[in-house]
């Protein structure tokens, strides 16, 4: 009886302590100046557990400043920093370096021409440590460490992100870029299924688009992927939807074609310890490795198919469908025109008419508009006729459009190119950035099938885009939706905004930005207050944006990114990441945290605290009484 009393009293103390510590830990994550921050010895233990792949991060430009100045290395970094492939491999760099700077004046470590006037290098938004993982076990170790010490955890693959989601100050980064395995399957068999699913490829989290294109071409395949060769295949691109500029018309979104994910979960469970050996000890174990497909963990599979990267777990591998690498004819129609509203609008309407007409014939393409100067714009429309080998046939089909354009514009160009394999169009070599030392910001808006395919749809969209204030260096381009993207709405279920199944074009707007705190702030203000209202006004009742390239200050992100899918996504977020280890800017559940994912905010956090605490208490009661009896 006395033993029972002491056990109950001990349990009460334990429960009280759990509630108290859970409350303390759930408000803000641990910061370097706080006693909770891991000691050097604890960081070294993590390093050993990960086979010495943990590194202490500094911005790549740090070698150019006094405390660690190395002139030769500085020159090398300045030269290599323009190589997108090199940046992808560097955990202390981002592709869009406007997000490397912090929020306070001077909290940056600029490189190149932006160094003028800067005498010190500051950390900015570059995480303090990076787990440069080589295996799923390394990912598990990093997850366990971040959970145990209540650290901000960031997932980075190649650093491509226009909203700053690949970095955060005072964080531990998991750098997935070394997970480079690629395996092709002639007829893939998924876990839990008796049937097979045809040709597919399994891709590690660090594989870049250009590398996958090259390997796929060697095997006679193409994949639904993006245009940039250094974007990671499996990370935010795939989990955010994955749009191919012209192949989505034929094969749907990339996320429509994913068959299975391998995931290290964010939740770290409290295991039931052995009643004899471990009574009195409750230890956290590593994040579980799970498979998610239509049969195994189907709710997680649904969430990962459009719910956004770095949110529900750390994806370490994905298996996707591949398609035959067919021949094609690429036909390019171009003009150089004035920014005069009437002339510009008429040219755009002609381009959109070509897109409208050829999309109905299952021919996809992309319009790219580059602002050359204050008075000059260059526009090129590239259409892809799949399974075609005769340029004369394509030229004949394009001739009426060329003649229509010549009635509007003086400077018109046209050419057609035969591609023995469609993969020849894909860029497989990393981009080399220009010499302007600028980053970029941008956003997107989708155009509905109802508007675009109306009789006056092309003219209406063109007139709306012509209203957009631009400056030299700005870029506007389309991504072709419709076709199989729309048909897939009846064939499969993803967590994408349902309105994607009624979208025919995605308008992308990108602006070069001086990578300073002031430059970023001014550009963000213009993007949110001027450009996005004008873009949304083109199709105001549709109001759909692409989360992978969205306004970093989007206030209504739940609705414009996910719509009616959001409620279920939030429910699954609380199931698979109950304590909010993975918070992505403008991602599912991020409204419960501050802008950097450091501190919980608002009433919902208290509700989560109660749910989490009760769940932990229930498990503690179960384990304790098992030991007592």
UniProtKB/Swiss-Prot annotation:
PROSITE patterns: FAD_PCMH (PS51387). This is FAD-linked oxidoreductase ifgC. Keywords: Alkaloid metabolism, FAD, Flavoprotein, Glycoprotein, Oxidoreductase, Signal. Belongs to the oxygen-dependent FAD-linked oxidoreductase family. Residues 1-30 form the signal peptide. Its EC number is 1.-.-.-. Glycans are attached at residues 47, 66, 134, 387, 453, 502, 526. It is an enzyme of class 1 (oxidoreductase). The gene is ifgC. FAD-linked oxidoreductase; part of the gene cluster that mediates the biosynthesis of isofumigaclavines, fungal ergot alkaloids. The tryptophan dimethylallyltransferase ifgA catalyzes the first step of ergot alkaloid biosynthesis by condensing dimethylallyl diphosphate (DMAP) and tryptophan to form 4-dimethylallyl-L-tryptophan. The second step is catalyzed by the methyltransferase ifgB that methylates 4-dimethylallyl-L-tryptophan in the presence of S-adenosyl-L-methionine, resulting in the formation of N-methyl-dimethylallyl-L-tryptophan. One of its GO terms (molecular function) is FAD binding. Residues 122-325 form the FAD-binding PCMH-type domain. Pathway: Alkaloid biosynthesis; ergot alkaloid biosynthesis. SUPFAM superfamilies: FAD-binding/transporter-associated domain-like. It comes from Penicillium roqueforti (strain FM164). One of its GO terms (biological process) is indole alkaloid biosynthetic process. It holds the Pfam family BBE. Its cofactor is FAD.
């Amino acid at each position: 009886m006395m033993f029972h009393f002491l056990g109950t009293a001990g349990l009460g103390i334990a429960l009280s302590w759990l509630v108290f510590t859970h409350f303390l830990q759930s408000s803000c994550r641990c910061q370097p100046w706080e006693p909770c921050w891991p000691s050097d010895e604890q960081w070294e233990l993590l390093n050993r557990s990960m086979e010495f792949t943990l590194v202490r991060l500094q911005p790549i430009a740090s070698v150019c400043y006094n405390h660690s100045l190395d002139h030769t290395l500085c020159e090398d970094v300045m030269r290599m920093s323009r190589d997108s492939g090199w940046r992808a491999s560097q955990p202390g760099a981002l592709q869009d370096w406007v997000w490397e700077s912090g929020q306070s004046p001077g909290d940056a470590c600029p490189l190149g021409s932006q160094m003028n006037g800067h005498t010190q290098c500051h950390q900015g938004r570059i995480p303090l440590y990076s787990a440069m993982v080589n295996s799923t076990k390394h990912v598990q170790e990093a997850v366990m460490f971040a959970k145990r010490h209540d650290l901000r955890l960031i997932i980075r693959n190649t650093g491509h992100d226009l909203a700053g989601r690949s970095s955060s100050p005072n964080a531990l980064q998991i750098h997935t870029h070394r997970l480079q395995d690629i395996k092709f399957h002639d007829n893939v068999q998924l876990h839990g299924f008796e049937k097979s699913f045809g040709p597919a490829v399994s891709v590690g989290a660090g594989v870049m688009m250009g590398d996958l294109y090259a390997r796929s071409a060697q095997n006679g395949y193409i994949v639904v992927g993006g245009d940039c060769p250094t974007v990671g295949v499996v990370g935010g691109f795939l989990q955010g939807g994955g749009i191919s500029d012209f192949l989505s018309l034929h094969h749907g979104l990339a996320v429509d074609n994913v068959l299975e994910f391998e995931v290290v979960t964010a939740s770290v469970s409290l295991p039931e310890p052995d009643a004899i050996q471990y009574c009195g000890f409750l230890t956290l174990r590593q994040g579980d490795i799970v498979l998610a497909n239509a049969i195994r963990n189907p709710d997680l599979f649904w969430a990962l198919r459009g719910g956004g990267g770095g949110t529900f777990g750390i994806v370490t591998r994905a298996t996707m469908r591949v398609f035959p690498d067919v021949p094609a004819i690429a036909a390019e129609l171009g003009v150089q025109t004035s920014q005069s509203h009437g002339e510009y609008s008429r040219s755009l309407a002609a381009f959109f008419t070509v897109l409208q007409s050829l999309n109905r014939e299952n021919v996809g393409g992309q319009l790219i508009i580059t602002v050359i100067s204050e008075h000059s714009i260059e526009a090129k429309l590239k259409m892809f006729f799949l399974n075609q080998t005769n340029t004369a046939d394509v030229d004949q089909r394009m001739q009426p459009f060329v003649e229509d354009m010549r009635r509007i514009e003086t400077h018109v160009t046209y050419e057609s190119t035969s591609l023995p394999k469609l993969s020849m169009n894909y860029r497989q070599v990393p981009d080399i950035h220009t010499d302007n030392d600028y980053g970029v910001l941008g956003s997107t808006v989708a155009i509905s099938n109802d508007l675009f395919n109306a009789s006056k749809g092309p003219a209406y969209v063109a007139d709306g885009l012509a209203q957009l204030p631009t400056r030299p260096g700005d870029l506007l381009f389309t991504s072709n939706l419709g076709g199989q993207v729309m048909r897939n709405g009846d064939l499969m279920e993803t967590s994408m905004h349902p309105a994607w199944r009624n979208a025919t074009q995605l308008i992308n707007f990108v602006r070069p930005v001086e990578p300073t705190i002031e430059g970023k702030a001014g550009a963000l203000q213009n993007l949110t207050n001027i450009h996005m209202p004008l873009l949304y006004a083109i199709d105001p009742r549709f109001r759909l944006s692409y989360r992978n390239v969205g306004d970093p200050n989007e206030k209504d992100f739940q609705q414009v990114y996910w719509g009616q899918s959001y409620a279920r996504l939030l429910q699954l977020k609380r199931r698979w990441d109950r304590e909010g280890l993975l918070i992505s800017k403008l991602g599912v559940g991020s409204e419960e945290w501050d802008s950097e994912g450091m501190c919980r905010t608002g009433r919902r956090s208290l509700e989560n605290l109660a749910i989490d605490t009760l769940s932990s208490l229930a498990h503690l009661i179960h384990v304790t009484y098992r030991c007592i009896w």
